[in-house]
């Protein structure tokens, strides 16, 4: 209790009844300031803040063709997190493994910073998961783990965010801005964005 996740649990309690869980947003309509979810339900708003990957929308209505094509050029990496129930004898919290012979590239040793934890977690790029000889006890594939920087990404995002913000749709955070932010930075950005759009 009172760990990092406690912040999000308390925030969720404050906005209970105003959040819909368990469904994907599949369409963003810039013309009518609304979203459509996978279950077919629409939600409208005066202002929309999007924090999901732009290229995860099945369709963005009202976006010019050149920006549609640009969004398709945004790149990301996918990471599998795999649990191993053994104990690693190390004082490290993270180990980085730059070894092409191993499928994983990073190990998270939770028991060194989270009391009562057992085992450790392997992080593996999606393209290397097949290198494991056996099935994992538990694993999770995060399709959108990290946004990747490409030569044209800054220009794409500048044009995209300028266009959508003129229509009261704001990209925020790691995926809304397609930038590798950690959550503490995003909380600060969210507070600043809320102050800005509340005074528009």
Where do the protein language model's features map onto the residues?
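Short beta-strand to alpha-helix junction loop
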Residues: 1-13, 20
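Alpha-helical elements of Rossmann-like donor-binding domains used by nucleotide-donor carbohydrate transfer enzymes
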Residues: 6, 10, 47, 159, ...
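Short, hydrophobic alpha-helical segments
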Residues: 15, 19, 44-46, 194-200
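Conserved beta-strand segments of alpha/beta enzyme cores
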Residues: 18-20, 135-136, 168
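Short loop/edge segments at beta-strand edges and connector loops
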Residues: 19-23, 29, 173
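Mid-domain catalytic core of redox enzymes
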Residues: 26-33, 37-145, 156-163
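C-terminal catalytic lobe of FAD-dependent flavoproteins
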Residues: 143-200
């Amino acid at each position: 209790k009172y760990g990092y996740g406690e912040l999000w649990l308390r925030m969720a309690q404050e906005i209970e009844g105003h959040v819909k869980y368990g469904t994907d947003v599949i369409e963003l309509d810039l013309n009518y300031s609304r979203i459509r979810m996978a279950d077919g339900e629409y939600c409208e708003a005066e202002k929309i803040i999007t924090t999901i990957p732009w290229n995860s929308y099945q369709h963005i209505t009202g976006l010019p063709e050149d920006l549609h094509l640009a969004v398709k050029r945004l790149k990301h990496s996918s990471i599998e997190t795999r649990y191993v129930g053994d104990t690693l004898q190390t004082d490290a919290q993270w180990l980085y493994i730059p070894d092409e012979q191993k499928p994983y590239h990073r190990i998270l040793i939770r028991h060194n910073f989270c009391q009562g934890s057992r085992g450790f977690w392997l992080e593996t790029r999606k393209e290397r998961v097949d290198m494991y000889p056996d099935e994992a006890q538990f694993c999770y594939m995060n399709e959108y783990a990290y946004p990747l920087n490409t030569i044209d990404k800054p220009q794409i995002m500048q044009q995209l965010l300028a266009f959508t913000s003129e229509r009261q749709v704001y990209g925020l955070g790691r995926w809304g801005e397609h930038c590798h932010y950690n959550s503490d930075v995003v909380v600060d950005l969210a507070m600043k964005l809320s102050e800005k759009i509340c005074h528009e």
